[in-house]
Amino acid sequence: MKIFLCIIAVVSLQGVVAFHVEREYAWKNITYEGIDPASYNIENSIPTAFAHDAASKKIFITVPRRNQIPFTLTELDTTKHPERSPPLSKFPGSDKLISVYQPVIDECRRLWIADVGQVEYKGDEQKYPKQKAAIIAYDLTKDNYPEIDRYEIPNNVAGNSLGFGGFAVDVTNPKEGCGNTFVYITNFEDNTLIVYDQEKKDSWKISHGSFKPEHDSTLSHNGEQYKYRVGIFGIALGDRDPEGNRPAYYIAGSSTKLFEISTKILKQKGAKFDPVNLGNRGPHSEAIALAYDPKTKVIFFAEADSRQISCWNIQKPLNHKNTDVIYASSKFIFGTDISVDSESQLWFLSNGQPPIDNLKLTFDKPHIRLMRVDTAKAIRRTKCEVKRVKP
């Protein structure tokens, strides 16, 4: 998702709302296990996203390919490395990957990635020749994570793959098997949503006005203001109905509105796309990442301009009065991913590197942080907590 993936700002006043958050990891710079630091560029080692496998206690972290980056897909064994600044290990079987922005783990413990098939810089065209973007799945239940699915996205569907944003994996009925699966990938540059039908090995793209940016958004950093304008970026899936369909919640990066569409529509190639505008989260609440927690019925947003992680309970109307803040810290700079794992733990990552030209970085203090908080604790005593009425 280009360097713009670094734009999710989660910077706020230190200690304002962070009562239940535990800082899991903090790095001054990324190191790689078994690799001499002199052989790679630490300034280019910018993690953008992750996926936590609760069963194995491993975290899979993506580092988009830039000059002198050894691995674009890595893993971190949290049992083996309990320290605060552990090295990242190479993901098995990832030698041929070009550049990966985000990993997702589904209910069948498959790790899904979208390899964009090209690099964002000049000079390594022979080493990393441009190829078709591909959706790839690995089996986390087996040793060395064998590749179990690969699909090359046609160019007319993928569009500019450097604009790939968030994506979601939709297993229709996990209790009956994992075969009937769909993948939804946003493209914030082309303002499209890509749908992959794993069973039929087919894909298509959807365009809609709600995917487009509504306005220029503003990012403030060190007293300066920077403008950006992006379309559909974040997508998250809600609860299944008896037929296995779910609401798909999505946001454009330069918009404060939240939209919903049933996956029943997404799964039908050529179906009429008629989303529901759920409401407006309020001024300066732009976000490009969101995550849904089925346990609490809450959607969490990593906001940009307001520099906070906010929440909204889907059981309430969506408006500014029904949203709240669950985390804010001046040290959590430029969050790049947010997700809820299978144990209802909310995780969010910041890499401390905004997409600003000629940005000068210092490596004397940790600027890359991975945080974790229990979702129920995070919303306690906020507007997002809906207490059950005892019969």
Swiss-Prot record:
Keyword Glycoprotein: yes
Tissue: Female salivary gland (at protein level).
Main location class: secreted
InterPro entries cross-referenced by the UniProt entry: 6-blade_b-propeller_TolB-like, Royal_jelly/protein_yellow
A Pfam short name: MRJP
Secretion signal span: 1-18
Residues modified by glycosylation: N29
Superkingdom assignment: Eukaryota
Keyword annotations: Glycoprotein, Secreted, Signal
Localization, UniProt: Secreted
Gene Ontology cellular component terms for the protein in this record: extracellular region
Family statement drawn from the similarity comment of this UniProt entry: Belongs to the major royal jelly protein family.
Function, as annotated: Probably modulates blood feeding of sand flies on vertebrate species by binding and sequestering different mediators involved in the host response. Binds biogenic amines. Binds serotonin and dopamine with high affinity. Binds adrenaline, octopamine and adrenaline with medium affinity. Binds histamine with low affinity.
The name this protein goes by in its record: Yellow-related salivary protein ASP4
UniProt source species: Phlebotomus orientalis (Phlebotomine sand fly)
